[in-house]
Amino acid sequence: MSSNDQINRTRALELALANIDRQYGKGAVMRMNDAQKAYIDVIPTGSIALDYALGVGGLPRGRIVEIYGPESSGKTTLTLHAIASVQRAGGIAAFIDAEHALDPEYAKKLGVDIDALLVSQPDSGEQALEISDMLIRSTAIDLIVIDSVAALVPRAELEGDMGDMHVGLQARLMSQALRKITSGLNQTGTTAIFINQLREKVGVFFGSPETTPGGRALKFYASVRLDIRRVETIKQGTEAVGNRTRVKVVKNKVAPPFKQAEFDVLYGVGISRESGLIDFAVDRGIIKKSGSWYVYGDDQLGQGKENARRFLLENKSVADEIENKIISLLGFRSNEFGDLPDHDAAVRTSPDTNSRKVSGTGAVHTTSGSPSAGKGTASGAVNNSRDSTGGDTPAGQGPLNLSVNRDVSTDTVSSKISDATHNQKPAGNGKSVKRKG
């Protein structure tokens, strides 16, 4: 190819890129090196072993994550720890409780600020996914959890008789919803966690008969898929106090897959941070184990793992020091929680979202609200029922570090998602949310 041809091709490309930027906004097309970050923003899971198995230090932001496993294996517990991590970093999380089984007291024990957590208990699968999409495109949500895919019942099935056959309805619903949700997640930096159950295929003689409901779309759209199982019961004497849990990363688009992590889940406590630190530090020589004794530097942590765990629980500075050494050894960033997504950038590039109405009782509200707060208005409002003068910001939760131009505090949130507009008009046809305090 001659030099003149090369120059003409370069000019034609620059002209095309300029036209695209004018029509769709700056950054609609960019070179890979411009778009690539030096690191991936993540949400810690609460288990340092699982953060390491994921390869990037936690659940990637702006992606879809699927967590599946048998009953009582720790799926919801894991997501509640992720919610607590987001809230400690000053972010906003939402929980779509399609199973109507969320326990606020248990969530509080795991470190979740239930006054700030947005909760929706939708009437149908369509309503749940529509609310999820509207929250994501509001550009104000950092993490949204859908519990669970199996409970997203299509409206046609709810309105039909008990014995009616509805072939493929849920799979088609999930496929359509994921096509819409995926683009919004990438533009806003929101992470969506789908909890899923297990089913068994009939007549399978070779390979695993286990499968997950909701069709195959979620398997393709998910950047990370986690298979979580109980492997043994933790006992003190004859009393069961928790479970040893194993998580296998069966799919990972951001790091090598098929790694495994094990950690302790204690009843009423959740994932034991201290037990995880002990296991990891012993494997890497940070904590020395002599017989049944655990020793860290000049400190004797205790005889037996339970005594060592209690020592770290009572001496937080020692636990923090061990954790920082592990993070440094593994190459994780010192700021484990990462930076919150640039919500202003999401506002500038967010796609056009028409005003939509969501009917029924599944409007979003906070867990501290009265039962009547859950009765949805037709516009699908987001309501936080705490008074702006009542209730302090929980310990360990910093102020919201979101760059969206809005007059809002962490104590009062009242947004009309369906017809919201922003003071600054974004590039293209995008619309955003103005939060009113």
Curated annotation (Swiss-Prot):
One of its GO terms (biological process) is DNA repair. Residues 350-371, 380-391, 400-426 have a biased composition (Polar residues). SUPFAM superfamilies: P-loop containing nucleoside triphosphate hydrolases (SSF52540), RecA protein, C-terminal domain (SSF54752). ATP binds at residues 69-76. The keyword ATP-binding applies. Gene3D superfamilies: P-loop containing nucleotide triphosphate hydrolases. Keywords: ATP-binding, Cytoplasm, DNA damage, DNA recombination, DNA repair, DNA-binding, Nucleotide-binding, SOS response. The keyword Transmembrane helix does not apply. InterPro entries: AAA+_ATPase, DNA_recomb/repair_RecA, DNA_recomb/repair_RecA_CS, P-loop_NTPase, RecA-like_C, RecA-like_N, RecA_ATP-bd, RecA_C_sf. Residues 343-437 are annotated as: Disordered. One of its GO terms (molecular function) is ATP-dependent DNA damage sensor activity. GO terms for cellular component: cytosol. It is found in: Cytoplasm. Can catalyze the hydrolysis of ATP in the presence of single-stranded DNA, the ATP-dependent uptake of single-stranded DNA by duplex DNA, and the ATP-dependent hybridization of homologous single-stranded DNAs. It interacts with LexA causing its activation and leading to its autocatalytic cleavage. Belongs to the RecA family. PANTHER family: MITOCHONDRIAL DNA REPAIR PROTEIN RECA HOMOLOG-RELATED (PTHR45900:SF1), RECA (PTHR45900). This is Protein RecA. It comes from Tropheryma whipplei (strain Twist) (Whipple's bacillus). The lineage of its organism: Bacteria, Bacillati, Actinomycetota, Actinomycetes, Micrococcales.
